[in-house]
Amino acid sequence: MPITYKIASEQGRITAFATGITRADDLHGLIRAILADPAFVPGLRALYDARYAEPDITIMQLAEVAGEVRQLLKRGLGRIAIAAESDTTYRVAKTFTVLARAIGIDVDVFREIDDAEAWLSKGA
């Protein structure tokens, strides 16, 4: 799986790292793994670092992923920041944010990791 993650409870953060080609199955696997992780507690915020990844995913699959992310919100996940450098990854992430916001997910995408980190820290 080209997506790994770590939970830093003391920082209130889940950080996921995506590399290579990422597909819907990878994202679904990430969500399932986080949901099953005993370190996942309410109040965490998430950073999805996709700077070194390229997506291979359809809009319909993005909508399905957004729907599954709602399970994380129901368990107490806060806002989600996405860091994306390539134009393709950025466009796909922007599409995801539109779909996710439509169902109540607080998410945004950034080209710079520092901007994503700063946004996550606001109001924390």
Residue ranges and their predicted role:
Residues M1-A124:
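Amphipathic, Lys/Arg-enriched alpha-helical "gate/interface" segment within cytosolic domains
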